[in-house]
Design a protein with these regions (language model features):
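A short, acidic, amphipathic alpha-helical segment used as a generic capping/interface helix at domain edges
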Residues: 72-76
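Short S/T/G/P-rich N-terminal loop/turn motif that feeds into the first structured element of a domain
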Residues: 1-52, 59-70, 80-118
Length: 118
């Protein structure tokens, strides 16, 4: 399997914040699109506009770290419109980098098979 780093973020859009959520999402998507090692950054919303899932994939751990380096600025924006429920990591990370995600709402899934064609 490739050394891509993949995770999903799940959360609830704050009551009455959907329009603001869309503006924040657009800002964060624009930022992520400019990152060289960001391969995939897709946001999906439930039909009732209450839940958001974000699928993120990076070229490697360095690219993922570069993306998260902006959390100091982008994190407060995101958290102003979303209550984060869960982060699921689908990659084998270094112990040091895994600590970035450590917490009660984090789940680590160990890759055991499959393939990526891109």
């Amino acid at each position: 399997m490739k050394k891509h780093v993949t995770w999903t973020v799940q959360g609830q859009i704050k009551e009455g914040k959907y329009d603001e959520f869309l503006l924040v999402m657009a800002q964060l998507v624009t930022l992520a699109k400019s990152e060289a090692g960001t391969l995939m950054y897709e946001w999906t919303v439930s039909e009732d506009k209450r839940n958001v899932h974000i699928y993120e994939r990076y070229q490697d751990e360095d690219a993922a770290k570069a993306h998260l380096a902006g959390w100091g600025e982008s994190g407060p924006l995101f958290l102003s419109v979303v209550d984060m429920d869960k982060v699921t990591v689908f990659s084998q990370l270094s112990e040091e980098f895994a600590q970035t995600f450590a917490g009660p709402s984090s789940v680590f899934m160990k890759p055991v098979g499959g393939f990526v064609k891109f």
